[in-house]
Amino acid sequence: LPASQFARAKELEAKAFRKILRTLKSNFDHVLIDAPAGIERSLRGLLSNEINECVLVCTPDDVCIRNAERTASVMRKKGLTAQRVIVNRLNPDYIRRGEMYAAQTVALTLDMPLLGEIPEDAEIYRALLHHQSVMEGESEGRNAIARIALRMTTDEDVPLPEYGQKRTLFQRLFQRRKKGDEKHVR
């Protein structure tokens, strides 16, 4: 469900919202609900026992992290303890220079398991501008989203990349390639 385009989120009644959720849950394995940044007082009433898990998506900046902390606190008070975080719009160069928090730092700050990290990706932005699926084509952002989807829908152990982490010369020389590659070093 996309984020509300209403002038005020309170225009959506909690009872109607729960009915919509029940209908969707009976037809789909997963229902993702987008919400505006933060959690307004009017949105708090929409939280219901129909929601099984909260996945907070935030960018690695102080304002967004504080907002995510407040949202997580409200969710916990409402009894929703299954929470994970996705860190969006990571820039590896900024992380290496210490100008941006790494995804693991954000997850530790929020005291939530890290579901995934999505790098800043011009291809994702271009797809959004052209109203195309971000899953078409090949890009690092698309691959990150696919890994997150796998983590959400399977028990498969999907490794988390570490955008912006410094690697030693030894790590760069002898890092294993993906399964199926002929060479074992890159």
Question: What role is predicted for each listed range?
Answer:
Residues 1-10, 28, 40, 99, ...:
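Proteins with a high burden of low-complexity, intrinsically disordered sequence enriched in S/T/G/P/A and R
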Residues 1-26, 126-130, 134-135:
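P-loop/Walker-type NTP enzyme "switch/lid" segment
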Residues 15-26, 30-120, 126:
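Conserved catalytic-core segment of NTP-binding enzymes
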Residues 77-186:
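C-terminal lobe/tail of nucleotide-utilizing enzymes
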